[in-house]
Amino acid sequence: MKKIILLFVFLVFYAPNALFAKADKLSNIPPASLEFINLEPQECNIACLFELLKKGRVFSFISRFGQNISNTQLLNAYYAILSGVELNSAEAIFTPINANTKIAVLIPKQSIKSYSFIVTNAILAYTASSDKAVAIKFFITKDESTLDETILALQSEGFKYVIAPITDAALPIISAQKYEKIFFYIPTLHASLAKEYNDNIVFGGIDYESQISALLEYANNKIASFGDGSRLSQLLNEQVKNFAPNAYIDVIDNKSVDLKSHLDNNKALQNASIFLNTTLLRASLLASQFRVYDLEPHAVLCTQICYDLVLFNLLRSADRAKMLVASSFGDIDDEIVAKAKILGIDLKFDRVAYPTIFGLDYIITQFLFNGTNARFNEIINNGQVAYRTHIYK
């Protein structure tokens, strides 16, 4: 039986509110996956799910479990089963062990949206492959408006190590002097986004600036960049401009389906090194339309936001012939990768999941069980995970 204990606490308040670039080949062979298929047409409500647990019908329980389920006992049972923990009762309530090592996971669900599931499942994948006696407790709260009281709550419970997938709006909160004895690891932000931060905070976010710098080694002097108006896209385009002040920047709203006005007879794109700082779908659409409008880029450049096999599978070989994609991820333990796939997470590509489990591994091997071999090769440098950039084509 796994020694890691997972606890989920839902604190929902309704108050108002490093760098060495090299070009590698990316395999297009999709990894194996395991899915639980629901063959029952009827909806399974809370009573139905409890009945399935009572009867020991685990696979039916997993396949019929919906994302709208908020019952704490059922959520605990769901994550326990996926983590390989045996259940002995229908209530499926975890009993805390007398562990000297505890880690809190602080999730402002409305702020990070779908990333809350990614962070949760990435942590579960790691814990399912670990034999360390660690108690992990999830504090799921509304947004930044309730973070302060949530941190006070976990602090009162004796938690000294916190994984916090937050936005930059929460940085002033966790940087408060009253929390200086708590170690915070932030997988969603890079240290460059913080004006100042304390020694008790480590950032695990992707270094997009280094990725852009590495990609520019394959560029010519004519730089162009597309964005989609999102906050991350704006940041990436600003960094492109920092390296290439004369770069041509074009923003295409994600709702827009008209690319002709952006591509047709656009001399700024001809023989240019073009950054696609957009969503995956928009990037694939742009890359496939260059030839349609007789555009021949010198290179098509993508950062981590487009590092996904889906992009390569969507494009024909001719459309990706000049494409280079940057990634900061290193090798990952196969066991963790396999368990993450069961939970619907691809650790080799997900830009939040990989930094999350790196942080969990870092806390366990450097603080809780100092001397234990780390499962990742990256190091911490000045409060930031030092990733090595790889270029794939």
PLM regions: where:
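Extracytosolic ligand-binding ectodomains
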Residues: K2-F10, A18-K393
